[in-house]
Amino acid sequence: MKNHSQIGLGFRREIADAFLDGSIKPDFIEVAPENWIELGGYWGDVFRKVTERLPLIAHGLSLSIGSPEELDYEFLKKLKTFLRTFNVKVYSEHLSFAKFENAHLFDLLPIPFREDSVKHISLRIRQVQDFLEMPLAIENVSYYTSVEAEMSESAFINNIVTESGCNLLLDVNNVFVNGSNHGYDPYQFIDTMPLDKVTYIHMAGHKRIAPDLIIDTHGEAIIEPVYQLFDYTLKKMNPVPVLLERDFNFPEIKELKAELSALKKIANKNLNYHAIH
């Protein structure tokens, strides 16, 4: 996949027809592999048709990289087959935990920003990378409660990236959401990120549900302050692919296309910026 102004869209069943009939044409797609592994029938056929046309990124939900249990190698075997079958070059996961005592929590919960967490997660990431024989990109997640901390979130992420050798999926909206909810400057946070390790970027909408609380929903349009933070981020780093996340509350296709166009416009502007600086 080329890394120049590549703007992708999450592939969801609700908008599958738009991919099939060509009314929407992103540069690549992203899916949660858990939703498509070993899937046959009608939707398996649809998925194969779409992935024959568009490059695919896999963004996992259930690896639970922060859990205390051993890794689920049966799942990893199926995942490895999926990644190879569909020629997936980038696999990402959330920097969170989603299981406890081998029970799925059906949520992505934050990990305490502690040194023992850094050691534990870095070891697990190396094990995953060795098994899959490819790098893993971890995503900075949104969180809504206080997290037991011995270090800042940015130091936590940097330490894991350094110790594990993994890459970073930078979710710009999550930076904005956490900055608003936890009272830090999202621009300063971007300045501290290991931007040379970013494999791709997530952009999405959020919803304000209280004066002091916004939620990363993936069900709203991107707001202007997040576009501005995105623009700032691209000026600080080399070009990478950008993925528009929309998981529900889908607008008309023309509105999704407008968001993709807005992202591409900003990305192309920053390509030109880097070309002359």
Question: Model-found features: residue ranges?
Answer:
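Acidic-and-aromatic substrate-binding clefts and catalytic sites of carbohydrate-active enzymes
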Residues: 16, 33-45, 64-74, 145-150, ...
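Acidic (Asp/Glu)-rich catalytic clusters
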Residues: 19-24, 41-58, 74-89, 126-131, ...
